[in-house]
Every structure is written in C-alpha cells, then in structure tokens.
C-alpha cells in the first residue's frame, strides 16, 4: 500500500475521514449509556443500562434520590447555528400551515366534483323517469334496426 506522501493518494480526504471517524467514535462513546460491566462496581445504578435479567418491577422507595431533569452540557450553540435553527423552525411552521390550507382546499374541490357527479346522475334519473328511455329514430347498430357491419 502506498504511503501517506504518495502522489496518487487523496491525502487530505483520507486524513479528514479518519479524523472525523475517530471524533465520532469518541462522541458516540460519551453519549451512549454505559453497561454495568464497563463501569465500576460502586457506580450508581441509575446511570447504567439495565441488564436483561434485572426485574422490571417498580420500587416505591429505593433510598436513591432521583436525578434532576435539567442536565448540564458542555455543547453550546454558536450564534449562527442558533439563528439557522430558528429560521428553519419558522419555515417548517409556515410549510405546515400551507399544507393544512392546501388540504382544506383540496377537500373542498373534491366535494364540489362529487356534488357535480351526484347532480348529473340525479338529473339523468329524473329525465329517465319523465321521458322514458331515449331511442334514436335511425336505429343503426341496435336490435331495432338492421345491423350493419
């Protein structure tokens, strides 16, 4: 295999990928829930993943205090990223409102088409009741006249 300084190697891309891979591995390790076997024996049980053999029954009082809901993180948003997220949320809410309006308009159009078809069918039934079946006087192609092929 060619070395790092070989001419035909996409060196920068390769180095960037390996760097990103190692960073993502570290990030995943920080964010994943630790198993009991990977932590110390005296670690609090609420911070580790449950074992499959652990009981799923709920104890009323275990003596441990529950963890607070607010968790302090070291990840901060830059001003630019915060603006981008706010802008995207605004666009998403506008898009959802537009989709709701379009759905309502679509339902109105479908109802009007359905009403037109219903009206046409009822008119046809009423005309049939008033006038009877319509028969053409020429009778071409019917059993009343001469069949021609």
From Swiss-Prot:
Biased amino acid composition, Low complexity: 30-41
Q: Name one GO biological process term.
A: ribosome biogenesis
Q: What InterPro entries would the database entry show?
A: Ribosome_bgen_Alb1
* Pfam short name (any one): Alb1
Where along the sequence do coiled-coil regions lie? Answer: none
| Region called Disordered, residue ranges | 1-58
Q: Where in the cell is it found?
A: Cytoplasm; Nucleus
**GO cellular component terms listed in the entry, alphabetical order:** cytoplasm; nucleus
Q: Which cysteines are joined by disulfide bonds?
A: none
Instruction: Print the keywords alphabetically.
Output: Cytoplasm, Nucleus, Ribosome biogenesis, Transport
The subunit field of the Swiss-Prot or TrEMBL record says: Component of the nucleoplasmic and cytoplasmic pre-60S ribosomal particles.
Functionally, this protein is described as follows: Involved in proper assembly of pre-ribosomal particles during the biogenesis of the 60S ribosomal subunit. Accompanies the pre-60S particles to the cytoplasm.
Q: Which family does it belong to?
A: Belongs to the ALB1 family.
Protein name (Swiss-Prot/TrEMBL): Ribosome biogenesis protein ALB1
- The gene is ALB1
């Amino acid at each position: 295999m060619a070395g790092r300084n070989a001419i035909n190697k996409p060196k920068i891309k390769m180095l960037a990928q390996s760097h990103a891979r190692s960073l993502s591995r570290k990030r995943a390790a920080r964010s994943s829930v630790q198993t009991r076997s990977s932590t110390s024996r005296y670690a609090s049980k609420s911070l580790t993943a449950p074992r499959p053999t652990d009981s799923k029954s709920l104890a009323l009082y275990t003596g441990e205090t529950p963890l607070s809901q607010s968790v302090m993180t070291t990840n901060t948003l830059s001003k630019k990223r915060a603006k981008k997220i706010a802008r995207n949320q605004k666009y998403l809410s506008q898009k959802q409102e537009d989709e709701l309006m379009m759905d309502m308009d679509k339902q109105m159009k479908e109802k009007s088409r359905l009403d037109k078809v219903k009206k046409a069918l009822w008119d046809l039934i009423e005309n049939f009741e008033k006038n009877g079946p319509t028969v053409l006087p020429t009778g071409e192609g019917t059993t009343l006249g001469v069949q021609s092929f």
